[in-house]
Curated annotation (Swiss-Prot):
This is G-protein coupled receptor homolog K2. GO terms for cellular component: host cell plasma membrane; membrane. It comes from Swinepox virus (strain Kasza). PROSITE patterns: G_PROTEIN_RECEP_F1_1, G_PROTEIN_RECEP_F1_2. Belongs to the G-protein coupled receptor 1 family. GO terms for molecular function: C-C chemokine binding; C-C chemokine receptor activity.
């Protein structure tokens, strides 16, 4: 499986695709990037496949969706982070939710760069190109690791409540989250060697793209990232999720304890929504990888690659939508968040009533003077 790189942000030069012998695609991102730039011109598509239609407006629809996701995700996650950060008595679950929201913020604050790069140029320089590429992977790994930690914590809290209770402290939660962030950074750091700010067909336009170098080190890093994403970012977390929640479910059913079910509800919803948002991208990437093994030249199967590009774009947008869904889950299910929101709303309502009373008193006193 190839890696779910930030294909909406990173673009690829098309010169390589005009060579019939070039078909070793390092990541499925290349399919999208090629189509997203020069190959998206209607003249090129008509020249190679008259039966394949291209929707020029699709790119701008995706940009609008990304802007909406940025507004909702930034407001929601900043609210959750500020709410939990200033909470006095934080539980270990609060620590995990706080770090998960911070991980979502990494994706959310990349969206403006993604939107701008959809205009087919990168003006932010080579250093920021590398930083944003690494941050995407850091956000991906940290998101999966923290959700995994939340699942393990719920497993011990319900299946082994007495045996593992001394280890379920706030200090342990902070230590585990710091370890998850550090491991995410270590796993993501090789990406800085893969992406560069490279001039496009026009010398005045630069794009943050996969490097053109084909040495053994670059090839090794590409394979390494594919293995990391597939095994550490997907297979191992999925196995842990299935095992933990199977044991949790059997324990709750056996004990018939509604209180324990209520305690896992928010974590279970986060895990399920995250998987729903990530799995479509993985499926599309897997299909595209299989296709790349049996098709040697993009222009001979242009319509197929174009459809894969659209599928990757939409599935990537769904994965970003996760950043907006998590704050909604906290609000609907989390009792602390709901109570905090209600207290804030009541304070605002009370302040407005006080202002209205003061204003009416001033108005009446001024009228009496007149």
């Amino acid at each position: 499986m190839t890696s779910p790189t930030n294909s909406t942000m990173l673009t690829y030069t098309t010169n390589n695709y005009y060579d019939d012998d070039y078909y070793e695609y390092s990541t499925i991102t290349d399919y999208y990037n090629t189509i997203n730039n020069d190959i998206t011109s209607s003249s090129v598509i008509k020249a190679f496949d008259n039966n394949c239609t291209f929707l020029e407006d699709t790119k701008y629809h995706i940009i609008v969706i990304h802007i909406i996701l940025f507004l909702l995700g930034s407001i929601g996650n900043i609210f959750v982070v500020s709410l939990i950060a200033f909470k006095r008595n934080k539980s270990i679950t609060d620590i995990y939710i706080l770090n998960l929201s911070m991980s979502d913020c990494i994706f959310v604050f990349q969206i403006p760069f993604i939107v701008y790069s959809k205009l087919d140029q990168w003006i932010f320089g080579n250093i920021l190109c590398k930083i944003m590429s690494v941050l995407y992977y850091v956000g991906f790994f940290s998101n999966m690791f923290i959700i995994t930690l939340m699942s393990i914590d719920r497993y011990f809290a319900i299946v082994h409540p007495i045996k593992r209770q001394p280890y379920r402290t706030k200090r342990i939660g902070i230590l585990m989250c710091c370890s998850a962030w550090l491991l995410s950074l270590i796993l993501s750091s090789p990406v800085s060697k893969l992406y560069e700010n490279i001039p496009h067909m026009s010398k005045d336009i630069y794009q943050c793209t996969l490097t053109n170098e084909n040495d053994s080190i670059i090839a090794f890093i590409k394979r390494l990232m594919q293995i990391e994403i597939t095994i550490l970012g997907f297979l191992i977390p999925i196995i842990i999720f299935v095992y933990c929640y199977y044991r949790i479910f059997t324990t709750v059913v056996r004990l018939r304890n509604r209180r324990k079910y209520k305690s896992i509800k928010i974590v279970l919803m986060i895990v399920v929504c995250s998987l729903i948002c990530w799995i479509p991208l993985y499926i599309v990437l897997m299909i595209a990888t299989i296709v790349s093994l049996y098709t040697s030249n993009i222009f001979r199967h242009l319509c197929l690659y174009l459809n894969l590009a659209y599928a990757i774009t939409f599935s990537e947008t769904i994965s970003l939508a996760r950043c907006c869904i998590n704050p909604i889950i906290y609000t609907l299910i989390g009792e602390h968040v709901r109570s905090r929101i209600s207290s804030i709303c009541s304070c605002i309502y009370r302040d407005n009533r006080i202002r209205k009373k003061l204003f009416s008193r001033k108005s009446s006193s001024s009228s009496n003077i007149i």
